[in-house]
């Protein structure tokens, strides 16, 4: 159960642990403990421990501690669903293993069980092992990525790893190795996530849709974590307010720190305020800071800051599109091309590092042109900033400052800017036109 990726090992070694607890401590003591037995060793890794796990969550659903034993392996061959939890700590000191039989997992997903772990209730804490060798969820996603058909971005019947809906809770030392696809859908209020690791690095096929945390809620922070994956490290969805993403390292073929996508369904009004992404290192990613909404969407995203972002070999360090496209998606209803999810009070401050000039893009491209190049005129891959506003009134109070991003080719950094008018964006920091980036 060792991490073998050299880059990931180096980053883990460089992190300084900063413990964060839950915002509010439970009122009642967790007086009951359920220690989950394992048949992994006695069966030489063939037995299914899912029934024992499900039994523990049923017996200790309230005011309890549920323990996966230290250094012990568990086969979780069937989904675990515990939606009646209250004031429970899930203590993951061992290692969990999903099935390696792709067809068996697909059949489970086809039956309607699309998420492998579902936890719901107030004050549900996840505490992983301090020892880096333990506390891992092993999903064996490499075989799925390698089996993905050529020129396809969507292998059928892939499970989501985890749905976690709680309040006044903490998630510490969450560790996911080779997730099949999406990692954690995190919903709720007053949640701290710290010291998480997502390792979706691949030795073969591209790890499509291996999002780190898809977030929806209020007062949520994700800090001191490492995510190497093939999609968003964090994607903030609506409705969300007061979200912090800080002191993290993200990369591999990451799609960065994202808001959205928003507005795909024009009847779903976007409502997002007060987001802060700060002190983040981004390595070998497609994007660093990204906003994505569909033309025809509706709603408002306000008061967003990306600050002190370090990029190494990133294709699009700062990227905004209000005309997002998805190569595998269709849209409901009638679309008004002049309607937009409005953006207001956005700041990009103190970005430094390199732009991927020589080998831009990533392995998610299955179309020609690549989905991430659609609508971008005369790309040079020297672009420090791309701002695609849908209309002349859909972007307001944009500010850039301290942008020190340099193409690997040593050419001057450039910018693509559409419809971010000087009247609505007096502190934009450069002239909104396509060409060389000249900060004011």
Swiss-Prot record:
Xref: Pfam families: Glyco_hydro_28 (PF00295)
Record's subcellular location: Secreted
PANTHER family recorded: EXOPOLYGALACTURONASE C-RELATED, PTHR31736
EC number(s) recorded for this UniProt protein: 3.2.1.67
Disulphide bridges: 389-395
Identification of the protein by name: Probable exopolygalacturonase C
Organism listed in the record: Aspergillus fumigatus (strain CBS 144.89 / FGSC A1163 / CEA10) (Neosartorya fumigata)
Catalysis: reaction(s): [(1->4)-alpha-D-galacturonosyl](n) + H2O = alpha-D-galacturonate + [(1->4)-alpha-D-galacturonosyl](n-1)
Protein's UniProt keywords contain Secreted: yes
GO CC field: extracellular region
């Amino acid at each position: 159960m060792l991490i073998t990726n050299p880059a990931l090992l180096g980053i883990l070694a460089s992190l300084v642990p900063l413990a964060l607890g839950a915002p509010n401590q439970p009122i009642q003591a967790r007086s009951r403990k359920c220690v989950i037995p394992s048949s992994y060793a006695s069966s030489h890794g063939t037995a299914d421990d899912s029934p024992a796990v499900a039994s523990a969550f049923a017996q200790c659903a309230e005011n309890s501690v549920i323990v996966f034993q230290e250094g012990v392996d568990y086969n979780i061959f069937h989904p675990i669903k515990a939606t009646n939890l209250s004031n429970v700590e899930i203590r993951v000191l061992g290692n969990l293993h999903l099935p390696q039989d792709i067809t068996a997992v697909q059949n489970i997903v086809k039956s309607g069980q699309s998420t492998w772990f579902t936890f719901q209730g107030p004050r549900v804490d996840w505490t992983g092992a301090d020892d880096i060798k333990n506390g891992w969820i092993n999903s064996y996603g490499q075989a799925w990525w390698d089996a993905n058909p050529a020129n396809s971005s969507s292998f059928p019947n892939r499970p989501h790893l985890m749905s976690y809906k709680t309040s006044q809770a903490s998630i510490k030392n969450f560790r996911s190795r080779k997730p099949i696809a999406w990692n954690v859908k995190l919903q709720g209020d007053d949640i701290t996530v710290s010291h998480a690791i997502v390792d979706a690095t691949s030795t073969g096929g591209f790890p499509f849709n291996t999002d780190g945390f898809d977030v929806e809620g209020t007062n949520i922070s994700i800090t001191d974590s490492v995510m190497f994956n093939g999609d968003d490290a964090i994607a903030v969805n609506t409705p969300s307010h007061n979200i912090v993403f800080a002191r993290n390292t993200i990369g591999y073929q990451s799609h960065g720190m994202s808001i959205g996508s928003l507005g795909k369904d024009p009847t779903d009004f976007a409502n997002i305020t007060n987001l802060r992404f700060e002190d983040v290192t981004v390595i070998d990613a497609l994007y660093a800071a990204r906003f994505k909404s569909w033309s025809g969407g509706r709603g408002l995203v306000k008061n967003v800051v990306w600050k002190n972002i370090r990029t190494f070999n990133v294709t699009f360090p700062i990227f905004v599109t209000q005309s997002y496209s998805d190569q595998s998606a269709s849209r409901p209803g009638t679309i008004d091309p002049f309607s937009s999810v409005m953006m207001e009070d956005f700041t990009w401050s103190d970005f430094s590092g390199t732009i991927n000039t020589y080998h831009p893009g990533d392995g998610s491209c299955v179309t020609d042109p690549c989905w991430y190049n659609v609508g971008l005129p005369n790309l040079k891959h020297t672009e420090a900033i791309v701002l695609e506003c849908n209309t002349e009134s859909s972007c307001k109070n944009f500010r850039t400052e301290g942008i020190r991003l340099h193409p690997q080719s040593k050419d001057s950094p450039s910018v693509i800017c559409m419809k971010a008018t000087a009247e609505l964006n007096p502190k934009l920091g450069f002239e909104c036109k396509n060409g060389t980036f000249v900060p004011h």
